[in-house]
Amino acid sequence: MAEIKNYTLNFGPQHPAAHGVLRLVLELDGEVIQRADPHIGLLHRATEKLAENKTFIQSVPYMDRLDYVSMMVNEHGYVLAIEKLLGIEVPERAQYIRVLFDEITRVLNHLMWIGAHALDVGAMAVFLYAFREREDLMDVYEAVSGARMHAAYYRPGGVYRDLPEAMPQYKASKIRNERALAKMNEARSGSVLDFIDDFFTRFPKCVDEYETLLTDNRIWKQRLVGIGVVSPERALQLGLTGPMIRGSGIAWDLRKKQPYEVYDRLDFDIPVGVNGDCYDRYLVRVEEMRQSTRIAKQCIEWLRKNPGPVITDNHKVAPPSRVGMKTNMEDLIHHFKLFTEGFHVPEGETYAAVEHPKGEFGIYLVSDGANKPYRLKIRAPGYAHLSALDEMARGHMIADAVTIIGTQDIVFGEIDR
Protein backbone atom coordinates (compact mmCIF):
# COMPACT_ATOMS: atom_id res chain seq x y z
CA MET A 1 0.00 0.00 0.00
CA ALA A 2 1.25 3.51 -0.86
CA GLU A 3 2.59 5.55 2.02
CA ILE A 4 0.53 8.70 2.62
CA LYS A 5 2.66 11.76 3.26
CA ASN A 6 1.60 14.57 5.55
CA TYR A 7 0.50 17.78 3.86
CA THR A 8 2.62 20.92 4.47
CA LEU A 9 0.91 24.30 4.61
CA ASN A 10 2.29 27.81 5.01
CA PHE A 11 0.26 29.87 7.47
CA GLY A 12 1.16 33.56 7.15
CA PRO A 13 3.03 35.89 7.06
CA GLN A 14 0.26 37.60 5.05
CA HIS A 15 -2.51 36.12 7.17
CA PRO A 16 -4.98 38.33 9.09
CA ALA A 17 -4.78 36.07 12.16
CA ALA A 18 -0.96 35.86 12.15
CA HIS A 19 -0.62 38.94 14.39
CA GLY A 20 2.00 40.74 12.39
CA VAL A 21 4.55 38.73 10.48
CA LEU A 22 4.28 35.21 11.88
CA ARG A 23 5.03 32.43 9.42
CA LEU A 24 4.00 28.95 10.50
CA VAL A 25 4.89 25.86 8.51
CA LEU A 26 2.13 23.44 9.46
CA GLU A 27 2.42 19.70 8.88
CA LEU A 28 -1.12 18.38 8.51
CA ASP A 29 -2.80 15.01 8.53
CA GLY A 30 -6.06 15.95 6.88
CA GLU A 31 -6.98 19.04 8.88
CA VAL A 32 -5.23 17.96 12.08
CA ILE A 33 -1.92 19.62 12.96
CA GLN A 34 0.94 17.15 13.43
CA ARG A 35 3.67 19.78 13.76
CA ALA A 36 3.79 23.58 13.84
CA ASP A 37 7.11 25.20 12.98
CA PRO A 38 7.20 28.98 13.65
CA HIS A 39 9.53 31.01 11.42
CA ILE A 40 10.50 34.31 13.00
CA GLY A 41 12.78 37.22 12.13
CA LEU A 42 10.63 39.01 9.56
CA LEU A 43 10.35 42.09 11.81
CA HIS A 44 13.96 42.10 13.08
CA ARG A 45 15.21 45.68 13.49
CA ALA A 46 18.37 45.08 15.57
CA THR A 47 17.07 46.99 18.61
CA GLU A 48 19.66 45.49 20.95
CA LYS A 49 22.51 46.45 18.60
CA LEU A 50 21.13 49.95 18.01
CA ALA A 51 21.00 50.52 21.78
CA GLU A 52 24.76 49.89 21.97
CA ASN A 53 25.38 52.93 19.74
CA LYS A 54 23.00 55.33 21.47
CA THR A 55 23.22 57.05 24.83
CA PHE A 56 21.10 55.58 27.62
CA ILE A 57 18.36 58.20 27.27
CA GLN A 58 18.24 57.95 23.46
CA SER A 59 17.24 54.28 23.68
CA VAL A 60 14.01 54.99 25.62
CA PRO A 61 11.94 55.49 22.41
CA TYR A 62 13.26 52.17 21.01
CA MET A 63 11.56 50.42 23.93
CA ASP A 64 8.14 51.73 22.82
CA ARG A 65 8.62 50.00 19.51
CA LEU A 66 9.20 46.53 20.95
CA ASP A 67 5.71 45.49 22.00
CA TYR A 68 3.90 48.34 20.30
CA VAL A 69 0.62 47.80 22.16
CA SER A 70 2.20 47.94 25.66
CA MET A 71 4.47 50.90 25.17
CA MET A 72 5.09 52.35 28.62
CA VAL A 73 5.66 49.00 30.36
CA ASN A 74 8.59 48.32 28.00
CA GLU A 75 10.09 51.68 28.96
CA HIS A 76 9.56 50.83 32.62
CA GLY A 77 11.77 47.73 32.49
CA TYR A 78 14.53 49.68 30.74
CA VAL A 79 14.58 52.68 33.09
CA LEU A 80 14.46 50.35 36.13
CA ALA A 81 17.65 48.64 34.92
CA ILE A 82 19.42 52.00 34.48
CA GLU A 83 18.25 53.20 37.92
CA LYS A 84 19.55 49.98 39.50
CA LEU A 85 23.04 50.58 38.10
CA LEU A 86 22.99 54.30 38.91
CA GLY A 87 21.64 53.63 42.41
CA ILE A 88 19.27 56.61 42.26
CA GLU A 89 16.04 57.10 44.18
CA VAL A 90 12.87 57.86 42.21
CA PRO A 91 10.44 60.37 43.81
CA GLU A 92 7.37 58.72 45.31
CA ARG A 93 4.94 60.63 43.10
CA ALA A 94 6.80 59.45 39.99
CA GLN A 95 6.53 55.85 41.22
CA TYR A 96 2.75 56.17 41.61
CA ILE A 97 2.45 57.78 38.16
CA ARG A 98 4.47 54.92 36.67
CA VAL A 99 2.29 52.30 38.34
CA LEU A 100 -0.86 54.12 37.18
CA PHE A 101 0.38 54.18 33.59
CA ASP A 102 1.55 50.56 33.79
CA GLU A 103 -2.03 49.60 34.62
CA ILE A 104 -3.49 51.90 31.95
CA THR A 105 -1.13 50.16 29.50
CA ARG A 106 -2.22 46.74 30.79
CA VAL A 107 -5.86 47.64 30.09
CA LEU A 108 -4.89 49.01 26.64
CA ASN A 109 -3.10 45.75 25.85
CA HIS A 110 -5.91 43.50 27.08
CA LEU A 111 -8.51 45.51 25.15
CA MET A 112 -6.49 45.06 21.97
CA TRP A 113 -6.08 41.36 22.79
CA ILE A 114 -9.77 40.68 23.51
CA GLY A 115 -10.83 42.56 20.36
CA ALA A 116 -8.32 40.84 18.06
CA HIS A 117 -8.76 37.40 19.66
CA ALA A 118 -12.55 37.57 19.32
CA LEU A 119 -12.23 38.81 15.73
CA ASP A 120 -9.92 35.89 14.87
CA VAL A 121 -12.43 33.42 16.31
CA GLY A 122 -15.31 35.12 14.48
CA ALA A 123 -16.90 37.58 16.94
CA MET A 124 -16.91 41.01 15.32
CA ALA A 125 -18.81 43.08 17.89
CA VAL A 126 -16.29 42.81 20.77
CA PHE A 127 -13.60 44.36 18.59
CA LEU A 128 -15.70 47.51 18.16
CA TYR A 129 -16.61 47.65 21.86
CA ALA A 130 -12.96 47.29 22.95
CA PHE A 131 -11.73 50.03 20.64
CA ARG A 132 -14.34 52.41 22.01
CA GLU A 133 -12.58 52.23 25.41
CA ARG A 134 -9.06 52.14 23.96
CA GLU A 135 -9.69 55.52 22.37
CA ASP A 136 -10.09 57.21 25.77
CA LEU A 137 -6.87 55.69 27.10
CA MET A 138 -5.01 56.68 23.93
CA ASP A 139 -6.16 60.24 24.63
CA VAL A 140 -4.61 59.96 28.12
CA TYR A 141 -1.31 58.88 26.54
CA GLU A 142 -1.52 61.86 24.22
CA ALA A 143 -2.34 64.27 27.04
CA VAL A 144 0.78 63.39 29.07
CA SER A 145 3.32 62.79 26.30
CA GLY A 146 2.00 64.27 23.06
CA ALA A 147 1.94 60.87 21.32
CA ARG A 148 -0.83 58.30 21.13
CA MET A 149 1.46 55.29 20.81
CA HIS A 150 5.19 55.84 21.19
CA ALA A 151 5.07 57.97 24.31
CA ALA A 152 8.71 57.99 25.58
CA TYR A 153 7.22 59.24 28.87
CA TYR A 154 9.38 57.39 31.42
CA ARG A 155 12.86 58.69 32.16
CA PRO A 156 15.73 57.35 34.24
CA GLY A 157 14.92 58.94 37.61
CA GLY A 158 11.19 59.53 37.12
CA VAL A 159 8.79 60.60 34.37
CA TYR A 160 8.99 63.33 31.72
CA ARG A 161 6.47 65.64 33.42
CA ASP A 162 3.63 65.73 35.94
CA LEU A 163 0.05 64.98 34.91
CA PRO A 164 -1.34 68.08 33.13
CA GLU A 165 -4.04 70.17 34.79
CA ALA A 166 -6.22 70.24 31.67
CA MET A 167 -7.48 67.41 29.48
CA PRO A 168 -7.58 68.18 25.72
CA GLN A 169 -11.16 68.64 24.49
CA TYR A 170 -12.99 67.89 21.27
CA LYS A 171 -13.39 70.91 18.99
CA ALA A 172 -16.55 71.93 17.15
CA SER A 173 -16.88 70.61 13.59
CA LYS A 174 -19.44 70.22 10.81
CA ILE A 175 -20.34 66.68 11.86
CA ARG A 176 -21.03 67.47 15.55
CA ASN A 177 -23.81 69.64 16.91
CA GLU A 178 -23.49 71.59 20.17
CA ARG A 179 -25.25 68.96 22.27
CA ALA A 180 -23.11 66.08 21.02
CA LEU A 181 -19.97 68.15 21.59
CA ALA A 182 -20.97 69.04 25.16
CA LYS A 183 -21.63 65.35 25.92
CA MET A 184 -18.26 64.29 24.49
CA ASN A 185 -16.42 66.93 26.52
CA GLU A 186 -18.32 66.26 29.75
CA ALA A 187 -15.55 64.13 31.29
CA ARG A 188 -12.82 66.32 29.80
CA SER A 189 -13.62 69.52 31.67
CA GLY A 190 -11.20 68.76 34.55
CA SER A 191 -7.60 67.57 34.81
CA VAL A 192 -6.08 64.45 33.24
CA LEU A 193 -6.36 62.73 36.64
CA ASP A 194 -10.11 63.53 36.74
CA PHE A 195 -10.51 62.03 33.27
CA ILE A 196 -8.64 58.83 34.26
CA ASP A 197 -10.78 58.61 37.41
CA ASP A 198 -13.96 58.99 35.36
CA PHE A 199 -12.76 56.32 32.91
CA PHE A 200 -12.02 53.74 35.62
CA THR A 201 -15.36 54.50 37.32
CA ARG A 202 -17.30 53.44 34.21
CA PHE A 203 -14.85 50.81 32.93
CA PRO A 204 -16.10 47.84 35.07
CA LYS A 205 -19.48 48.13 33.29
CA CYS A 206 -17.67 47.92 29.94
CA VAL A 207 -15.90 44.73 31.07
CA ASP A 208 -19.33 43.35 32.03
CA GLU A 209 -20.46 44.08 28.45
CA TYR A 210 -17.57 42.05 27.00
CA GLU A 211 -18.36 39.21 29.38
CA THR A 212 -22.05 39.29 28.39
CA LEU A 213 -21.01 38.91 24.75
CA LEU A 214 -18.43 36.17 25.31
CA THR A 215 -18.14 34.35 28.66
CA ASP A 216 -21.27 32.17 28.44
CA ASN A 217 -21.53 32.31 24.66
CA ARG A 218 -21.93 28.75 23.35
CA ILE A 219 -19.83 29.27 20.22
CA TRP A 220 -17.06 31.09 22.17
CA LYS A 221 -16.82 28.21 24.66
CA GLN A 222 -16.81 25.59 21.89
CA ARG A 223 -13.87 27.38 20.27
CA LEU A 224 -11.84 27.92 23.49
CA VAL A 225 -12.60 25.24 26.10
CA GLY A 226 -10.08 22.39 26.05
CA ILE A 227 -7.93 24.02 23.35
CA GLY A 228 -4.17 24.50 23.85
CA VAL A 229 -4.02 22.92 27.31
CA VAL A 230 -0.74 23.42 29.22
CA SER A 231 -0.21 21.64 32.55
CA PRO A 232 1.33 23.65 35.45
CA GLU A 233 4.54 21.55 35.34
CA ARG A 234 4.90 21.99 31.58
CA ALA A 235 4.17 25.73 31.83
CA LEU A 236 7.15 26.09 34.20
CA GLN A 237 9.42 24.01 31.95
CA LEU A 238 8.48 26.03 28.87
CA GLY A 239 9.25 29.33 30.61
CA LEU A 240 5.72 30.71 30.27
CA THR A 241 4.95 33.87 32.26
CA GLY A 242 2.10 36.31 32.77
CA PRO A 243 -1.47 35.23 31.94
CA MET A 244 -0.09 32.15 30.16
CA ILE A 245 1.32 30.62 33.38
CA ARG A 246 -1.50 31.97 35.58
CA GLY A 247 -4.03 30.33 33.24
CA SER A 248 -2.34 27.02 34.10
CA GLY A 249 -2.94 27.54 37.82
CA ILE A 250 0.38 29.02 39.01
CA ALA A 251 0.01 32.34 40.85
CA TRP A 252 3.25 33.88 39.57
CA ASP A 253 3.10 37.67 39.25
CA LEU A 254 6.17 39.89 39.62
CA ARG A 255 4.03 42.66 41.12
CA LYS A 256 3.46 40.36 44.13
CA LYS A 257 6.52 38.05 44.09
CA GLN A 258 9.23 40.64 43.35
CA PRO A 259 7.48 43.97 43.98
CA TYR A 260 8.93 47.03 42.26
CA GLU A 261 7.93 50.71 42.62
CA VAL A 262 4.94 50.90 45.02
CA TYR A 263 3.13 47.64 44.18
CA ASP A 264 3.76 46.28 47.69
CA ARG A 265 1.58 49.09 49.11
CA LEU A 266 -1.37 48.41 46.82
CA ASP A 267 -4.24 46.01 47.35
CA PHE A 268 -5.03 43.67 44.44
CA ASP A 269 -5.45 39.97 43.68
CA ILE A 270 -3.80 37.63 41.17
CA PRO A 271 -6.40 35.85 39.01
CA VAL A 272 -5.50 32.19 38.41
CA GLY A 273 -6.98 29.59 36.04
CA VAL A 274 -7.70 25.91 36.71
CA ASN A 275 -7.59 23.97 33.43
CA GLY A 276 -4.77 25.72 31.56
CA ASP A 277 -6.78 26.03 28.34
CA CYS A 278 -7.57 29.03 26.11
CA TYR A 279 -10.82 29.70 27.99
CA ASP A 280 -9.05 29.96 31.36
CA ARG A 281 -6.48 32.34 29.90
CA TYR A 282 -9.35 34.45 28.56
CA LEU A 283 -10.95 34.57 32.05
CA VAL A 284 -7.60 35.45 33.66
CA ARG A 285 -7.07 38.43 31.34
CA VAL A 286 -10.63 39.69 31.81
CA GLU A 287 -10.17 39.57 35.59
CA GLU A 288 -6.80 41.33 35.21
CA MET A 289 -8.63 44.28 33.69
CA ARG A 290 -10.78 44.48 36.84
CA GLN A 291 -7.69 44.25 39.09
CA SER A 292 -5.96 46.99 37.06
CA THR A 293 -9.01 49.16 37.73
CA ARG A 294 -8.55 48.56 41.48
CA ILE A 295 -4.85 49.48 41.34
CA ALA A 296 -5.50 52.59 39.22
CA LYS A 297 -8.17 53.82 41.64
CA GLN A 298 -5.73 53.53 44.58
CA CYS A 299 -3.03 55.41 42.63
CA ILE A 300 -5.46 58.19 41.69
CA GLU A 301 -6.49 58.61 45.32
CA TRP A 302 -2.84 58.88 46.44
CA LEU A 303 -1.85 61.26 43.63
CA ARG A 304 -4.69 63.65 44.48
CA LYS A 305 -3.47 64.00 48.07
CA ASN A 306 0.30 64.11 47.50
CA PRO A 307 1.79 66.69 45.13
CA GLY A 308 5.55 66.66 44.68
CA PRO A 309 8.47 66.25 42.25
CA VAL A 310 8.15 63.66 39.46
CA ILE A 311 11.81 63.30 38.51
CA THR A 312 15.05 63.08 40.48
CA ASP A 313 16.84 66.34 41.37
CA ASN A 314 20.19 64.82 40.34
CA HIS A 315 20.94 66.98 37.28
CA LYS A 316 23.63 64.60 36.07
CA VAL A 317 20.79 62.21 35.19
CA ALA A 318 17.70 64.40 34.71
CA PRO A 319 17.61 67.80 32.97
CA PRO A 320 17.28 70.93 35.15
CA SER A 321 14.23 73.18 34.86
CA ARG A 322 13.98 75.77 32.07
CA VAL A 323 13.89 78.56 34.65
CA GLY A 324 17.08 77.26 36.27
CA MET A 325 18.86 77.07 32.92
CA LYS A 326 18.12 80.71 32.13
CA THR A 327 19.49 81.99 35.43
CA ASN A 328 22.16 79.48 36.48
CA MET A 329 25.29 78.67 34.47
CA GLU A 330 25.77 75.29 36.18
CA ASP A 331 22.27 74.16 35.19
CA LEU A 332 22.98 75.17 31.59
CA ILE A 333 26.19 73.09 31.61
CA HIS A 334 24.30 70.08 33.04
CA HIS A 335 21.65 70.44 30.34
CA PHE A 336 24.23 70.69 27.56
CA LYS A 337 26.21 67.68 28.81
CA LEU A 338 23.06 65.61 29.27
CA PHE A 339 21.79 66.12 25.72
CA THR A 340 25.13 65.89 23.92
CA GLU A 341 27.13 63.26 25.78
CA GLY A 342 24.49 61.79 28.11
CA PHE A 343 25.22 60.44 31.58
CA HIS A 344 27.79 57.76 32.41
CA VAL A 345 26.52 54.65 34.17
CA PRO A 346 28.88 52.89 36.63
CA GLU A 347 30.50 49.66 35.50
CA GLY A 348 28.44 46.56 36.24
CA GLU A 349 25.57 44.40 35.10
CA THR A 350 21.98 44.07 36.22
CA TYR A 351 18.66 42.48 35.35
CA ALA A 352 15.39 44.32 35.86
CA ALA A 353 12.03 42.69 35.18
CA VAL A 354 8.50 44.07 35.17
CA GLU A 355 5.12 42.34 34.99
CA HIS A 356 4.30 43.16 31.39
CA PRO A 357 0.70 42.58 30.17
CA LYS A 358 2.03 39.56 28.24
CA GLY A 359 4.39 38.15 30.90
CA GLU A 360 7.82 38.85 32.36
CA PHE A 361 9.57 41.58 30.39
CA GLY A 362 13.22 41.74 31.43
CA ILE A 363 16.18 43.93 30.57
CA TYR A 364 19.69 42.58 31.14
CA LEU A 365 22.03 45.55 31.01
CA VAL A 366 25.84 45.50 30.99
CA SER A 367 27.69 48.79 31.45
CA ASP A 368 31.42 49.37 31.01
CA GLY A 369 31.26 52.83 32.59
CA ALA A 370 30.55 54.62 29.30
CA ASN A 371 27.58 56.76 28.28
CA LYS A 372 26.15 53.87 26.20
CA PRO A 373 25.22 50.31 27.19
CA TYR A 374 27.97 47.76 26.50
CA ARG A 375 25.25 45.14 25.98
CA LEU A 376 21.47 45.23 26.24
CA LYS A 377 19.57 41.94 26.24
CA ILE A 378 15.79 41.98 26.07
CA ARG A 379 13.81 39.11 27.61
CA ALA A 380 10.54 39.21 25.68
CA PRO A 381 7.63 37.15 27.08
CA GLY A 382 6.18 36.38 23.64
CA TYR A 383 9.37 34.58 22.56
CA ALA A 384 8.91 31.79 25.13
CA HIS A 385 5.17 31.61 24.41
CA LEU A 386 5.68 31.23 20.66
CA SER A 387 8.22 28.45 21.21
CA ALA A 388 5.46 26.53 23.05
CA LEU A 389 3.09 26.84 20.06
CA ASP A 390 4.15 23.53 18.48
CA GLU A 391 3.33 21.60 21.65
CA MET A 392 0.05 23.47 22.24
CA ALA A 393 -1.22 23.05 18.67
CA ARG A 394 -0.49 19.34 18.11
CA GLY A 395 -3.62 17.27 17.59
CA HIS A 396 -5.81 20.34 17.03
CA MET A 397 -7.46 21.60 13.83
CA ILE A 398 -6.07 24.48 11.70
CA ALA A 399 -8.83 26.77 13.01
CA ASP A 400 -7.69 26.03 16.57
CA ALA A 401 -4.15 27.19 15.72
CA VAL A 402 -5.67 30.65 15.22
CA THR A 403 -7.26 30.44 18.69
CA ILE A 404 -3.95 29.39 20.26
CA ILE A 405 -2.00 32.21 18.58
CA GLY A 406 -4.69 34.61 19.84
CA THR A 407 -4.55 33.32 23.42
CA GLN A 408 -0.75 33.68 23.46
CA ASP A 409 -1.24 37.40 22.73
CA ILE A 410 1.69 37.56 20.33
CA VAL A 411 3.16 40.83 19.08
CA PHE A 412 6.13 40.49 16.79
CA GLY A 413 7.85 43.74 17.70
CA GLU A 414 9.19 42.15 20.89
CA ILE A 415 9.81 38.65 19.52
CA ASP A 416 11.94 39.74 16.54
CA ARG A 417 13.14 43.03 18.05
From Swiss-Prot:
Which compartment or compartments is the protein found in?
Cell inner membrane
Q: What class of enzyme is it?
A: translocase
Q: Which reaction does it catalyse?
A: a quinone + NADH + 5 H(+)(in) = a quinol + NAD(+) + 4 H(+)(out)
The cellular component terms of Gene Ontology attached to this UniProt record, alphabetical and capped at eight, are:
plasma membrane
Q: Which InterPro entries match?
A: NADH_Q_OxRdtase_suD (IPR001135), NADH_UbQ_OxRdtase_49kDa_CS (IPR014029), NDH1_su_D/H (IPR022885), NiFe-Hase_large (IPR029014)
Query: How does it sit in the bilayer?
Result: Peripheral membrane protein
Keyword match Translocase: yes
UniProt keywords (A-Z) are: Cell inner membrane, Cell membrane, Membrane, NAD, Quinone, Translocase, Transport, Ubiquinone
Presence of the UniProt keyword Membrane in the record: yes
Q: What is its EC number?
A: 7.1.1.-
Q: Name one GO molecular function term.
A: quinone binding
Supply the Pfam families for this chain.
Answer: Complex1_49kDa
Q: What is stated as this protein's family in its record? A: Belongs to the complex I 49 kDa subunit family.
Q: Which HAMAP family does the protein's record reference?
A: NDH1_NuoD
Q: How does it assemble?
A: NDH-1 is composed of 14 different subunits. Subunits NuoB, C, D, E, F, and G constitute the peripheral sector of the complex.
What does this protein do, in the record's words?
NDH-1 shuttles electrons from NADH, via FMN and iron-sulfur (Fe-S) centers, to quinones in the respiratory chain. The immediate electron acceptor for the enzyme in this species is believed to be ubiquinone. Couples the redox reaction to proton translocation (for every two electrons transferred, four hydrogen ions are translocated across the cytoplasmic membrane), and thus conserves the redox energy in a proton gradient.
Protein name per its UniProtKB record:
NADH-quinone oxidoreductase subunit D
